[in-house]
């Protein structure tokens, strides 16, 4: 997604649930869907390490499967969801549905990818036409044309584009220009002098050389290594001028409208007309420069790099972008770099899993339409809708009770909250795939066609009214998000089913788990980025100056608190990068706790497995985030991801008074904070 203001939960699990009844029949439900008493380490004091207390035994006995970079509750549910998708695709491939139907396209796409022998037999042949086109480039204008064409098939370029609602006119779609084109995950991988980053750079150099040789672009190993080094040096120059992850969170700075004439004037050195024409943007009068200084600096770099280096760069990006659809040599090279070197994953996923994911990326809503009929019942949707309403009501009461916010800002905040659009389960209108051509027997072309289709689908939106029925996730995704330009919260079907959500579950675990997630997404409308957008989704300042300053004081303290956390030896969390998500975690748990007590209606909750209602609420929250990681992916997440790692997210509880009361946490406990040091924003 282009901006952090469509703020997702990422991929982390929601809650396991447990039964409110203590009957013998319900004890099985507690075991299946409740907090995991067997995974707790009762030798650890909750106040010293709440994550270890809630999840310690589970973490010690859990082994990460070879084809995963991490493993947690989400991983288990993802496996289940992928199994459902596999069944849908397998049935589609056997259905012999009429040509042109979604079922036929899904079946052909999946069956073609699964025909490994046919793909192996073609070797590097599918690349031939694209690489020949790159080889013919003999001017910088043709280079710009090639870059504009490359983004249409999903290749990452130094200047890329995307379509999104206009910040100032969120009822209309517009075009944004952004930075990109790096082979490593982030600029810091090029610029950091740490040993792990140096190792990642060495792995990338070897991978780039391998792609040049496998594709036939470089005639020998020695030649490929030298040419890959020149491409790496080019990317290093790009990394130096690109915006950092933290700087990219400054959304007002990312809204800089430039006219077509502004681009050659403010970013000389690049053939903008050729680029825009090739990208299908020749008639667009205004395009938002979302990283203006980086765009100008990139344009200045272009003519200083020899064309042969640029051509090798384009070839590497082309091969890397679609290597999973080529023969085994390409697949293995791609996996060894992206999954093993960068994420620590030792084993390649089964082919059916890869095929399911690629089909979901290409035709996600076509799969989703079948998925919700089979796996998402009306009872779950109705119960989830009511739960969201309860959390919205609790959020409103929380705003009303803030002692640091003025009445004027509270009124505007309530207006925004009342205007929230809530989407549950699946879209009301399914995506039209009639223009997507799927060719039986050509996996590589199908991948390109899917990317072209998605690009053209978005390009057709430019200048048109925003479709507020559109979803940014498929129903099968175990995730959720808030979109500031639409002022909406979205919860796909897969997160609203057991064991994530059970309409009959214990209130404590349901609210501590999925309730905190819903509260988290609601709060994104008022985090350090979301608060910059009004009830209509427009970038507008609706805060009093005094309230904005009080808010900044609190968020500055939160940055300092999280920046002190060490994730790996010598690797601290970036509290500025993770600020919005940390606000969401801290707000989500207090909103959910308020809603939980409202839902109790004055009733005393039962004690289950020795845990009070308050304790089960916090266990629902903590066990939600239990995950074990391989170090390389954890390092990548700390460098690039606005979410704190899961063990850090569990520490949210130390800012919440009720957690101290639930476990009698006292001075001297490792997580103890004096009341004056507990950060309270919402």
List PLM regions with ranges:
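Short, Gly/Pro- and small/polar-rich lid/capping loops
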Residues: 26-38
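Active-site-surrounding "flap" and adjacent substrate/cofactor-binding loops of secreted or lumenal enzymes
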Residues: 28-29, 44-114, 118
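Sec/Tat signal peptide C-region and signal peptidase I cleavage site
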Residues: 20-24
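Hydrophobic/aromatic-rich, well-ordered segments within soluble, folded domains that form packed cores
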Residues: 40-60, 190, 194-213, 579, ...
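N-terminal secretory signal peptides that target proteins for export/translocation
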Residues: 1-5
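Noncatalytic, helix-rich "gating/capping" subdomain that lines the substrate-entry/channel surface
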Residues: 92-386, 390
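Bacterial N-terminal signal peptides
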Residues: 8-19
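Intrinsically disordered, low-complexity linker/terminal regions across diverse proteins
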Residues: 26, 78, 237, 266-269, ...
């Amino acid at each position: 997604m282009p901006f952090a203001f469509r703020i997702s939960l990422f991929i982390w699990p929601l809650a396991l649930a447990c039964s409110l009844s203590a009957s013998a029949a319900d004890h099985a439900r507690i075991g299946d869907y409740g907090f995991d008493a067997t995974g707790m380490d009762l030798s650890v004091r909750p106040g010293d390490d709440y994550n270890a207390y809630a999840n310690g035994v589970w973490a010690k006995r859990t082994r990460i499967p070879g084809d995963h970079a991490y493993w947690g509750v989400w991983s288990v549910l993802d496996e289940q969801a992928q199994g459902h998708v596999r069944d849908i695709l397998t049935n589609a491939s056997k259905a012999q549905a009429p040509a042109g139907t979604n079922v036929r396209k899904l079946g052909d796409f999946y069956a073609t990818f699964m025909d490994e022998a046919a793909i192996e037999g073609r070797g590097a042949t599918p690349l031939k036409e694209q690489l020949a086109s790159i080889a013919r480039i003999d001017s910088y204008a043709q280079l710009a044309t090639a870059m504009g064409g490359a983004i249409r098939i999903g290749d990452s370029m130094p200047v890329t584009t995307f379509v999104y609602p206009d910040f100032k006119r969120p009822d209309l779609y517009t075009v944004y220009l952004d930075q990109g084109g790096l082979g490593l995950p982030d600029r810091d991988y090029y610029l950091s002098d740490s040993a792990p980053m140096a190792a990642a750079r060495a792995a990338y150099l070897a991978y780039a050389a391998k792609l040049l040789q496998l594709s036939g672009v470089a005639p020998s190993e020695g030649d490929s290594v030298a040419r890959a080094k020149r491409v790496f040096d080019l990317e290093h120059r790009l990394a130096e001028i690109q915006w950092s992850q933290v700087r990219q969170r400054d959304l007002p700075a990312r809204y800089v409208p430039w006219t077509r004439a502004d681009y050659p004037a403010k970013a000389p050195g690049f053939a903008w007309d050729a680029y825009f024409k090739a990208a299908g943007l020749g008639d667009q009068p205004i395009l938002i420069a979302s990283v203006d200084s980086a765009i100008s600096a990139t344009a200045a770099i272009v003519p200083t790099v020899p064309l042969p280096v640029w051509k090798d760069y384009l070839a590497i990006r082309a091969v890397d972008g679609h290597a999973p659809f080529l023969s085994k040599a390409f697949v293995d090279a791609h996996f060894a770099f992206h999954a093993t070197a960068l994420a620590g994953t030792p084993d390649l996923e089964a082919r059916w899993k890869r095929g399911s994911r690629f089909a979901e990326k290409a035709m996600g809503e076509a799969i989703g339409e079948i998925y919700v009929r089979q796996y998402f019942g009306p009872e779950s949707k109705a119960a989830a809708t009511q739960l969201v309403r309860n959390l919205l009501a609790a959020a409103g009461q929380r705003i009303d009770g803030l002692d640091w916010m003025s009445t004027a800002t509270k009124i505007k905040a309530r207006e925004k909250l009342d205007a929230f659009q809530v989407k549950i389960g699946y879209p009301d209108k399914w995506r039209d795939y009639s223009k997507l051509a799927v060719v039986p027997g050509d996996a590589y072309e199908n991948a390109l066609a899917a990317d072209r289709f998605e690009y053209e689908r978005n390009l057709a939106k430019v200048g048109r009214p925003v479709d507020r029925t559109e979803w940014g996730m498929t129903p099968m995704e175990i995730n959720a998000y808030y979109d500031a330009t639409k002022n909406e919260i979205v919860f796909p079907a897969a997160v609203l089913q057991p064991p994530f959500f059970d309409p009959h579950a214990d209130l404590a675990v349901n609210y501590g788990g999925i309730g905190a997630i819903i509260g988290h997404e609601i709060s994104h409308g008022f985090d350090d980025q979301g608060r910059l957008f009004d009830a209509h989704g427009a970038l507008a300042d609706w805060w009093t100056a005094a309230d904005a300053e009080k808010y900044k004081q609190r968020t500055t303290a939160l940055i300092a608190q999280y920046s002190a956390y060490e994730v790996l030896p010598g690797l601290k969390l970036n509290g500025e990068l993770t600020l919005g998500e940390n606000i969401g975690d801290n707000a989500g748990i207090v909103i959910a706790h308020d809603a939980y007590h409202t839902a109790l209606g004055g009733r005393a909750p039962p004690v289950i497995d020795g845990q009070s209602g308050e304790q089960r609420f916090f266990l629902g929250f903590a066990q939600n985030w239990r995950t074990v990681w391989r170090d390389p992916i954890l390092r990548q997440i700390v460098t690039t991801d606005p979410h704190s790692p899961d063990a850090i997210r569990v520490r949210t509880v130390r800012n919440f008074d009720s957690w101290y009361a639930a476990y009698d946490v006292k001075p001297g406990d490792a997580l103890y904070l004096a009341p004056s040091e507990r950060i309270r924003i919402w």
